[in-house]
Amino acid sequence: MNHRKKAVLIVISALLVIGLFAGGFYLKAIGDYKAKVNALTFDEIDLTKVNDGIYEGQCDTGIVRARVQVTVRDYRMESIELLEHENGRGTPAEAILDQMLQNQTTAVDAVSGATCSSKVIRKAVENALSAGLPG
């Protein structure tokens, strides 16, 4: 085998090994992300116990992250502002903010096709409301 073929074979082998490692890291990151999303738990927040104010909450699962600002007045969510939403294809999940305001609860259905982002946004809103609870 001449030197040129040998060099090409070495380069191809090195690229293959690098690709396998990168693929492994990617699959691990996806697995960790899905485990974090599946581990999210939700509590129904009683709005009659949330003090009036503006509260910020966030949820970060590594790949999908959301940060929100919730304004509460007279035991109602007056507004929910999405300050940050890093996602893959989860932009449609942002529609749950309107559902939460309309229904005055965080217990809304996830958006089909954007389930993980829906859960992350929902948890961020729940965390914001929790900050307004006494004690």
PLM segments and residue spans:
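Intrinsically disordered terminal and processing segments
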Residues: 1-67, 71-135
